C-alpha cells in the first residue's frame, strides 16, 4: 500500500505521500507519484490502495470538479455517491485525500466524505503512524511541510509498505 498525509497549519495546506508500490510482499517500484495537483492546480489529491483503481477515481474526481468548479466538497460528495452505488466503481479498492485552499477531505468507497478536525489526516498502510506523529507535532513551531515530512518519515520507519521517497505538494490555505 502506501501512506498519504495532509497537514493544514500556518496558512498552508501540505499533502505528502511516499512512492512505494508493492505487489504482495515485493516492492515493485519505489518512486511512484501518488500525490498530484488536479482541477487546474487548485486541488491536491493523494491516493492509497490499488493504483489502477485510484487513477480511475482521480479521473472521476477531475470530471466532478469540472462539473462543480470551485466546489470541492460537492464534487467529493458526488464522487462518493457514484463510488458507493455504481456496480463497477463499488469494487474499486482505494482511498483518497483531497484538499484545496479551504477544505481537506478523505473519500472512501463506503461513501464516506470525512473532514479532519485536528488539522491533519492520513490514509494508507502507515496512515495511523503518520497521523499520530502529526498530531504530536501540530502544537510545535514546525511548519506544515515539516510536520508532513517528519510524520511520513516516522511512518516509513515503522510500516514496511511505506518508503522514504516523498512527493510533497503545497497550497496557500485560507
UniProtKB/Swiss-Prot annotation:
Keyword tags: Allosteric enzyme, Cytoplasm, Hydrolase, Metal-binding, Protease, Sodium, Threonine protease
Function: Protease subunit of a proteasome-like degradation complex believed to be a general protein degrading machinery.
Species whose genome carries this gene: Agrobacterium fabrum (strain C58 / ATCC 33970) (Agrobacterium tumefaciens (strain C58))
Pfam family for this entry, one: Proteasome
Active site per UniProt: 2
Enzymatic reactions: ATP-dependent cleavage of peptide bonds with broad specificity
Protein name: ATP-dependent protease subunit HslV
Keyword Cytoplasm: yes
Swiss-Prot/TrEMBL GO biological process terms: proteolysis involved in protein catabolic process
Broad EC category: hydrolase
Listed PROSITE patterns: PROTEASOME_BETA_2
Annotated HAMAP family: HslV
Oligomeric and partner information: A double ring-shaped homohexamer of HslV is capped on each side by a ring-shaped HslU homohexamer. The assembly of the HslU/HslV complex is dependent on binding of ATP.
Family assignment from sequence similarity: Belongs to the peptidase T1B family. HslV subfamily.
Subcellular location as annotated: Cytoplasm
GO cellular component: HslUV protease complex; proteasome core complex
CDD domains for the chain: protease_HslV
GO molecular function: metal ion binding; threonine-type endopeptidase activity
Summary of activators and inhibitors of this protein: Allosterically activated by HslU binding.
InterPro entries from the UniProt entry: ATP-dep_Prtase_HsIV_su, Ntn_hydrolases_N, Proteasome_sua/b, Proteasome_suB-type
Amino acid at each position: 500500500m502506501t501512506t498519504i498525509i495532509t497537514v493544514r497549519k500556518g496558512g498552508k495546506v501540505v499533502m505528502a505521500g511516499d512512492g512505494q508500490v508493492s505487489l504482495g510482499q515485493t516492492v515493485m517500484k519505489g518512486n511512484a507519484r501518488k500525490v498530484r495537483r488536479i482541477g487546474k492546480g487548485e486541488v491536491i489529491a493523494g491516493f492509497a490502495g490499488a493504483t489502477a483503481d485510484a487513477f480511475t477515481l482521480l479521473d472521476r474526481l477531475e470530471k466532478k470538479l469540472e462539473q462543480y468548479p470551485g466546489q470541492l466538497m460537492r464534487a467529493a460528495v458526488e464522487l462518493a455517491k457514484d463510488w458507493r452505488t455504481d456496480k463497477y466503481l463499488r469494487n474499486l479498492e482505494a482511498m483518497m485525500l483531497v484538499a484545496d485552499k479551504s477544505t481537506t477531505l478523505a473519500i472512501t468507497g463506503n461513501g464516506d466524505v470525512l473532514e479532519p478536525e485536528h488539522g491533519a489526516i492520513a490514509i494508507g498502510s502507515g496512515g495511523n503512524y503518520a497521523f499520530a506523529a502529526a498530531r504530536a507535532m501540530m502544537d510545535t513551531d514546525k511548519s506544515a511541510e515539516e510536520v508532513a515530512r517528519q510524520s511520513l518519515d516516522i511512518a516509513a520507519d515503522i510500516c514496511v509498505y511505506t518508503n522514504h521517497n516523498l512527493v510533497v505538494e503545497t497550497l496557500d490555505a485560507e
